[in-house]
Amino acid sequence: MMLHAQHMPGQPGAPSLVFLHGFSGDCREWQPVGEQFHGCSRLYIDLPGHGGSAAIPVGRFADVIRLLRATLISYNILKFWLVGYSLGGRVAMMAACQGIPGLCGLVVEGGHPGLQNEQARAERRLSDGRWAERFRREPLTEVFHDWYQQPVFASLTAQQRQALTALRSQNNGETLAAMLEATSLAAQPDLREALNALAFPFYYLCGERDSKFRALAQEVAATCHVIRNAGHNAHRENPAGVVDSLAQILRL
Protein backbone atom coordinates (compact mmCIF):
# COMPACT_ATOMS: atom_id res chain seq x y z
CA MET A 1 0.00 0.00 0.00
CA MET A 2 1.17 3.53 -0.79
CA LEU A 3 0.04 7.01 0.14
CA HIS A 4 -1.74 9.32 -2.27
CA ALA A 5 0.56 12.01 -3.61
CA GLN A 6 1.01 14.57 -6.36
CA HIS A 7 4.26 14.32 -8.31
CA MET A 8 5.80 17.13 -10.35
CA PRO A 9 8.83 16.17 -12.47
CA GLY A 10 12.08 18.13 -12.44
CA GLN A 11 15.47 17.98 -14.09
CA PRO A 12 17.17 14.57 -14.28
CA GLY A 13 19.87 14.05 -11.67
CA ALA A 14 18.64 16.67 -9.22
CA PRO A 15 17.46 15.44 -5.81
CA SER A 16 13.71 15.29 -5.26
CA LEU A 17 11.90 17.37 -2.66
CA VAL A 18 9.39 15.35 -0.64
CA PHE A 19 6.89 17.52 1.23
CA LEU A 20 4.91 16.39 4.29
CA HIS A 21 2.02 18.53 5.54
CA GLY A 22 0.84 19.20 9.08
CA PHE A 23 -2.14 17.78 10.98
CA SER A 24 -5.41 18.37 9.10
CA GLY A 25 -3.57 19.62 5.99
CA ASP A 26 -3.08 17.79 2.69
CA CYS A 27 -0.77 17.56 -0.31
CA ARG A 28 -1.69 21.09 -1.44
CA GLU A 29 -0.28 22.70 1.70
CA TRP A 30 3.33 22.98 0.55
CA GLN A 31 2.69 23.65 -3.15
CA PRO A 32 2.94 27.47 -3.06
CA VAL A 33 6.47 26.96 -1.73
CA GLY A 34 7.49 23.82 -3.58
CA GLU A 35 6.43 25.03 -7.02
CA GLN A 36 9.16 27.67 -6.87
CA PHE A 37 11.72 24.86 -7.27
CA HIS A 38 11.04 23.65 -10.80
CA GLY A 39 14.52 22.21 -11.19
CA CYS A 40 13.78 19.52 -8.61
CA SER A 41 11.07 16.92 -8.86
CA ARG A 42 8.49 17.51 -6.12
CA LEU A 43 6.40 14.94 -4.33
CA TYR A 44 3.54 16.27 -2.21
CA ILE A 45 2.22 13.48 0.00
CA ASP A 46 -1.17 13.09 1.69
CA LEU A 47 -0.45 11.57 5.10
CA PRO A 48 -2.79 8.82 6.37
CA GLY A 49 -6.20 10.10 7.43
CA HIS A 50 -5.83 13.17 5.19
CA GLY A 51 -6.82 14.11 1.64
CA GLY A 52 -6.50 11.26 -0.84
CA SER A 53 -5.04 9.04 1.90
CA ALA A 54 -8.00 9.54 4.26
CA ALA A 55 -9.10 5.91 3.99
CA ILE A 56 -5.64 4.46 4.71
CA PRO A 57 -5.65 3.18 8.31
CA VAL A 58 -2.72 3.38 10.71
CA GLY A 59 -2.46 2.18 14.28
CA ARG A 60 1.10 3.19 15.12
CA PHE A 61 3.74 5.72 14.14
CA ALA A 62 5.68 2.85 12.56
CA ASP A 63 2.82 2.32 10.08
CA VAL A 64 3.24 5.88 8.81
CA ILE A 65 6.98 5.43 8.26
CA ARG A 66 6.38 2.14 6.45
CA LEU A 67 3.84 3.80 4.14
CA LEU A 68 6.22 6.69 3.48
CA ARG A 69 8.96 4.28 2.47
CA ALA A 70 6.60 2.37 0.15
CA THR A 71 5.44 5.60 -1.46
CA LEU A 72 8.98 6.76 -2.19
CA ILE A 73 9.79 3.39 -3.75
CA SER A 74 6.64 3.48 -5.87
CA TYR A 75 7.71 6.82 -7.37
CA ASN A 76 11.29 5.57 -7.83
CA ILE A 77 12.59 8.41 -5.66
CA LEU A 78 16.17 7.40 -4.88
CA LYS A 79 17.76 10.72 -3.83
CA PHE A 80 15.70 13.28 -1.93
CA TRP A 81 15.26 15.88 0.80
CA LEU A 82 12.43 15.54 3.30
CA VAL A 83 10.61 18.79 4.08
CA GLY A 84 7.95 18.58 6.78
CA TYR A 85 5.79 20.92 8.82
CA SER A 86 4.59 20.17 12.39
CA LEU A 87 3.18 16.60 12.20
CA GLY A 88 4.93 16.20 8.84
CA GLY A 89 8.14 17.40 10.44
CA ARG A 90 7.82 14.79 13.17
CA VAL A 91 7.23 12.09 10.55
CA ALA A 92 10.30 13.32 8.67
CA MET A 93 12.45 13.27 11.82
CA MET A 94 11.26 9.78 12.73
CA ALA A 95 12.04 8.50 9.24
CA ALA A 96 15.46 10.14 9.23
CA CYS A 97 16.39 8.75 12.64
CA GLN A 98 15.32 5.23 11.68
CA GLY A 99 17.31 5.40 8.47
CA ILE A 100 15.67 5.79 5.08
CA PRO A 101 17.67 5.05 1.90
CA GLY A 102 18.45 7.98 -0.36
CA LEU A 103 17.84 10.76 2.16
CA CYS A 104 20.14 13.71 1.36
CA GLY A 105 18.93 16.13 4.01
CA LEU A 106 16.15 17.12 6.37
CA VAL A 107 14.20 20.38 6.67
CA VAL A 108 11.73 20.63 9.55
CA GLU A 109 9.37 23.53 10.16
CA GLY A 110 7.91 23.69 13.66
CA GLY A 111 8.30 19.98 14.42
CA HIS A 112 8.68 18.73 18.01
CA PRO A 113 11.73 16.49 18.64
CA GLY A 114 9.92 14.64 21.44
CA LEU A 115 8.85 14.80 25.06
CA GLN A 116 11.52 14.01 27.62
CA ASN A 117 9.70 12.32 30.51
CA GLU A 118 6.83 9.96 31.17
CA GLN A 119 4.71 12.52 32.99
CA ALA A 120 4.75 14.80 29.95
CA ARG A 121 3.87 11.86 27.71
CA ALA A 122 0.98 10.83 29.97
CA GLU A 123 -0.39 14.37 29.97
CA ARG A 124 -0.09 14.61 26.20
CA ARG A 125 -1.76 11.22 25.74
CA LEU A 126 -4.76 12.42 27.74
CA SER A 127 -4.91 15.71 25.86
CA ASP A 128 -4.68 14.09 22.43
CA GLY A 129 -7.26 11.51 23.48
CA ARG A 130 -9.71 14.27 24.36
CA TRP A 131 -9.13 16.01 21.05
CA ALA A 132 -9.54 12.71 19.17
CA GLU A 133 -12.87 12.10 20.89
CA ARG A 134 -14.05 15.55 19.89
CA PHE A 135 -12.96 15.02 16.28
CA ARG A 136 -15.03 11.83 16.22
CA ARG A 137 -18.18 13.21 17.81
CA GLU A 138 -18.51 16.96 17.24
CA PRO A 139 -18.93 19.17 14.16
CA LEU A 140 -15.47 19.93 12.81
CA THR A 141 -16.16 23.66 12.63
CA GLU A 142 -16.62 23.69 16.41
CA VAL A 143 -13.57 21.53 17.08
CA PHE A 144 -11.25 23.55 14.85
CA HIS A 145 -12.58 26.80 16.29
CA ASP A 146 -11.22 25.62 19.64
CA TRP A 147 -8.14 23.94 18.12
CA TYR A 148 -6.88 27.27 16.80
CA GLN A 149 -7.27 28.87 20.22
CA GLN A 150 -4.30 26.82 21.48
CA PRO A 151 -1.25 28.88 22.58
CA VAL A 152 0.90 27.68 19.67
CA PHE A 153 -1.47 29.51 17.31
CA ALA A 154 -1.54 32.73 19.35
CA SER A 155 0.00 34.78 16.54
CA LEU A 156 -2.93 34.13 14.18
CA THR A 157 -5.41 36.92 13.56
CA ALA A 158 -9.15 36.31 13.93
CA GLN A 159 -9.45 36.33 10.14
CA GLN A 160 -6.67 33.74 9.77
CA ARG A 161 -8.35 31.52 12.38
CA GLN A 162 -11.66 31.71 10.54
CA ALA A 163 -10.03 30.83 7.22
CA LEU A 164 -8.15 27.87 8.69
CA THR A 165 -11.25 26.61 10.51
CA ALA A 166 -13.25 26.65 7.27
CA LEU A 167 -10.44 24.93 5.35
CA ARG A 168 -9.66 22.23 7.91
CA SER A 169 -13.35 21.45 8.51
CA GLN A 170 -13.44 19.79 5.08
CA ASN A 171 -11.61 16.81 6.62
CA ASN A 172 -13.05 13.55 7.94
CA GLY A 173 -13.20 13.71 11.74
CA GLU A 174 -12.95 9.95 12.25
CA THR A 175 -9.79 9.55 10.19
CA LEU A 176 -8.20 12.65 11.71
CA ALA A 177 -8.83 11.21 15.17
CA ALA A 178 -7.20 7.90 14.27
CA MET A 179 -4.11 9.63 12.87
CA LEU A 180 -3.89 11.94 15.88
CA GLU A 181 -3.84 8.94 18.22
CA ALA A 182 -1.38 6.93 16.10
CA THR A 183 1.11 9.80 15.82
CA SER A 184 0.54 11.52 19.16
CA LEU A 185 3.59 13.22 20.58
CA ALA A 186 3.07 10.80 23.47
CA ALA A 187 3.82 7.93 21.06
CA GLN A 188 6.99 9.52 19.70
CA PRO A 189 10.36 8.86 21.33
CA ASP A 190 12.65 11.71 22.27
CA LEU A 191 14.66 12.11 19.06
CA ARG A 192 17.23 14.67 20.23
CA GLU A 193 20.15 12.26 20.58
CA ALA A 194 19.44 10.53 17.28
CA LEU A 195 18.95 13.85 15.47
CA ASN A 196 22.24 15.15 16.81
CA ALA A 197 23.99 12.10 15.34
CA LEU A 198 22.61 12.48 11.80
CA ALA A 199 25.26 12.22 9.10
CA PHE A 200 23.48 14.52 6.61
CA PRO A 201 22.36 18.18 6.70
CA PHE A 202 19.55 19.07 9.11
CA TYR A 203 17.83 22.46 9.03
CA TYR A 204 15.06 23.83 11.20
CA LEU A 205 12.63 26.57 10.19
CA CYS A 206 10.46 28.48 12.64
CA GLY A 207 8.48 31.69 12.62
CA GLU A 208 9.89 34.62 14.57
CA ARG A 209 6.65 34.79 16.60
CA ASP A 210 6.73 31.07 17.44
CA SER A 211 8.57 31.30 20.76
CA LYS A 212 7.93 27.67 21.77
CA PHE A 213 9.49 26.17 18.66
CA ARG A 214 12.28 28.73 18.46
CA ALA A 215 13.32 27.42 21.88
CA LEU A 216 12.97 23.78 20.80
CA ALA A 217 15.13 24.48 17.74
CA GLN A 218 18.04 25.23 20.08
CA GLU A 219 17.82 21.72 21.54
CA VAL A 220 18.78 19.92 18.33
CA ALA A 221 21.94 20.10 16.22
CA ALA A 222 20.24 21.85 13.32
CA THR A 223 20.96 25.08 11.50
CA CYS A 224 17.98 27.29 12.34
CA HIS A 225 16.34 29.71 9.91
CA VAL A 226 13.95 32.15 11.59
CA ILE A 227 11.17 33.24 9.22
CA ARG A 228 10.19 36.87 9.70
CA ASN A 229 6.58 38.00 10.09
CA ALA A 230 5.37 34.47 10.83
CA GLY A 231 4.18 32.30 13.68
CA HIS A 232 3.93 28.51 13.91
CA ASN A 233 2.77 27.94 10.31
CA ALA A 234 5.54 29.93 8.67
CA HIS A 235 5.16 28.56 5.15
CA ARG A 236 1.52 29.68 5.11
CA GLU A 237 2.07 33.05 6.78
CA ASN A 238 5.23 33.99 4.86
CA PRO A 239 5.74 31.61 1.92
CA ALA A 240 8.29 33.92 0.28
CA GLY A 241 10.42 33.83 3.42
CA VAL A 242 10.35 30.04 3.47
CA VAL A 243 11.17 29.90 -0.25
CA ASP A 244 14.21 32.11 0.39
CA SER A 245 15.38 29.85 3.23
CA LEU A 246 14.91 26.68 1.18
CA ALA A 247 16.80 28.22 -1.72
CA GLN A 248 19.73 28.95 0.61
CA ILE A 249 19.58 25.46 2.09
CA LEU A 250 19.39 23.72 -1.28
CA ARG A 251 21.81 26.24 -2.86
CA LEU A 252 19.42 26.89 -5.73
UniProtKB/Swiss-Prot annotation:
It comes from the Bacteria. This is 2-succinyl-6-hydroxy-2,4-cyclohexadiene-1-carboxylate synthase. GO terms for molecular function: 2-succinyl-6-hydroxy-2,4-cyclohexadiene-1-carboxylate synthase activity. Monomer. Its EC number is 4.2.99.20. It catalyses: 5-enolpyruvoyl-6-hydroxy-2-succinyl-cyclohex-3-ene-1-carboxylate = (1R,6R)-6-hydroxy-2-succinyl-cyclohexa-2,4-diene-1-carboxylate + pyruvate. Catalyzes a proton abstraction reaction that results in 2,5-elimination of pyruvate from 2-succinyl-5-enolpyruvyl-6-hydroxy-3-cyclohexene-1-carboxylate (SEPHCHC) and the formation of 2-succinyl-6-hydroxy-2,4-cyclohexadiene-1-carboxylate (SHCHC). Keywords: Lyase, Menaquinone biosynthesis. SUPFAM superfamilies: alpha/beta-Hydrolases. Belongs to the AB hydrolase superfamily. MenH family. Pathway: Quinol/quinone metabolism; 1,4-dihydroxy-2-naphthoate biosynthesis; 1,4-dihydroxy-2-naphthoate from chorismate: step 3/7; Quinol/quinone metabolism; menaquinone biosynthesis. InterPro entries: AB_hydrolase_1, AB_hydrolase_fold, SHCHC_synthase_MenH. The gene is menH. GO terms for biological process: menaquinone biosynthetic process. It is an enzyme of class 4 (lyase).
